[in-house]
Design a protein with these regions (language model features):
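Hydrophobic alpha-helical segments at protein termini of multi-pass membrane proteins
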Residues: 1-229
Length: 229
């Protein structure tokens, strides 16, 4: 019975995370749902997230081990955040580049779906990681935090795709790395008890929503704007 309870909670909470993600990305395009590359990008996004737990912890541990014992909190924390931002956005960038070569017509929607999949993969991984802590449903703030993270990954996937489409990846990639780094830094401030979880989630959700509105504006603006030759 405990196993059933544990996995019942996992399935139900995972379904909530999935519905949150789909509800967030839907306003960007209704037509995109009928195109199979969108679903492929979603599945690839989920899959490539699992490269992160393999590569990111060793990289961050190496960085921590190379610091002197008296390194400042800011240097330590911003380095960990930057490593996470660089690694995760480079993974998205490389796979999105492959999609750009294969499916160039709808790359903005594909970028958003790849970001959605990445955010869902992160949510499923975190949910599975905490499965032994409790048999009850995760708290409301947990789902708010996951909504914020999914929203951010959709935003960043879109901005990367926009960079590919408009041939400005040299600007888009550093931008998304900075935004991702800022988000991780905010979370680390909570982990180190510098700010409350509600503050971290609230600020993160507000910032992700603003970026989401920017992405929507750019998406519909792009539909009316010819590509540069």
């Amino acid at each position: 019975m405990p196993i059933f309870d544990e996995y019942g909670v996992l399935i139900f909470a995972g379904a909530i995370i999935l519905l949150i993600g789909l509800a967030i990305v839907l306003p960007l395009s209704l037509k995109g749902w009928r195109r199979w590359p969108s679903w492929l990008a979603l599945l690839v996004g989920v899959g490539i997230y699992f490269l992160v737990p393999l590569a990111q912890p060793p990289l961050q541990n190496w960085a921590l081990g190379s610091f002197p014992s008296d390194v400042s909190f800011f240097i330590r924390t911003i380095t960990l955040a930057l490593l996470a931002g660089v690694l995760q956005e480079l993974i998205k960038f490389l796979f999105l580049g492959g999609f750009r070569l294969l499916f160039s017509d709808n790359i903005l929607w594909i970028g958003a779906m790849l970001g959605l999949g990445f955010g869902l993969g992160e949510g499923f991984y975190i949910l599975y990681s905490i499965r032994n802590l409790t048999y009850s449903m995760p708290s409301f703030v947990f789902f708010l935090d996951r909504a914020s993270a999914i929203l951010l990954h959709i935003d960043l996937g879109f901005f990367l795709a926009y960079g590919f489409k408009r041939r400005i990846t040299a600007a888009a990639l550093p931008l998304v790395i900075v935004l991702h780094t800022a988000s991780v830094y905010l979370g680390l401030l909570h982990v180190d008890k510098k700010i409350s979880m509600w503050t971290a989630v609230g600020v993160g959700l507000a910032a992700s929503f603003v970026l989401y509105l920017v992405a929507i504006c750019y998406y519909f603006k792009d539909q009316r704007r010819p590509l540069k030759k």
